[in-house]
A protein has these predicted regions:
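A hydrolase-biased, glycine/serine/histidine/acidic-enriched motif that marks catalytic-domain neighborhoods
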Residues: 1-235
Length: 235
């Protein structure tokens, strides 16, 4: 069967997953394995866990920290929004994240975005330079657009299969996907989907008090698994 260019691009996601599984096996050859993936990383840990479970490994915890399962992660409402309104929305979001965090969370927030600020400045400079170079060099611009489209395919075109185990989703209840109860994961055939709401924006899941609450909840799942294993041993 002849493979299309899109198939080759899509396979890159699968190759990355295989590489991660190989690295995991080098460190820990056998399960049980506990997984937590944040945002876009959730798609990777889901597929890693699914393939490991398929090969017979035990996955007692597969948790997704406000990860999405959509054909496109961008919200059309936000994309079509006027630029000024979009920027004002971002400012409002970050102010809300800062205010709703506790003291420790605010300190962590400032530390994170202090380093993020310099990263973003460097990134914006590179984007600005690429745009200038694209206008001066048509061939370069065409190649850049080709790479952009290929990366988009990598992110959005890999088809995830169902998973027979339990998926734990920590769902941010503020922001553009607030009304989407399961972030699209209910569109897959899962053994069980457990959704825990977090009273924060997507960007707030990495700061206190959300972090402690997520940690405590995950600990409950781990303790439950350990107790079940002890019960099996006694039998």
């Amino acid at each position: 069967m002849r493979r299309s260019k899109n198939d080759e691009i899509t396979d890159d996601f699968g190759k990355k997953v295989k590489k991660y599984i190989s690295q995991i096996k080098e460190v820990r050859p056998e399960g049980p394995y506990l997984f937590l993936g944040e945002s876009a990383g959730g798609k990777y840990v889901y597929e890693i866990a699914r393939q490991l479970a398929e090969s017979g490994d035990e996955i007692p915890v597969l948790a997704l920290l406000d990860s999405y399962h959509y054909s496109n992660s961008k919200n059309n409402t936000m994309v079509k929004m006027p630029r000024v309104n979009y920027l004002l929305g971002l400012i409002e979001k970050h102010i809300t994240i800062f205010i709703s965090s506790d003291k420790r969370g605010r300190i962590d927030y400032l530390k994170y975005y202090q380093s993020e600020f310099f990263f973003r400045i460097n990134w914006l400079f590179k984007v600005f330079w690429r745009r200038i170079k694209s206008k001066l060099d048509k061939k370069y611009g065409e190649e850049l657009e080709k790479i952009r489209k290929e990366k988009s395919l990598l992110r959005n075109k890999y088809k995830l299969a169902g998973y027979p185990g339990k998926v734990i989703l920590f769902k941010a209840t503020k922001g553009q996907y607030a009304n989407v109860l399961a972030n699209g994961w209910d569109g897959l055939k899962l053994g069980e989907l457990k959704v825990h709401p977090l009273n924060c924006y997507h960007g707030g899941v990495l700061f206190e008090p959300a972090v402690s609450w997520v940690g405590a909840t995950l600990n409950d799942y781990v303790v439950e698994f350990i107790n079940n294993e002890k019960t099996k041993t006694k039998k």
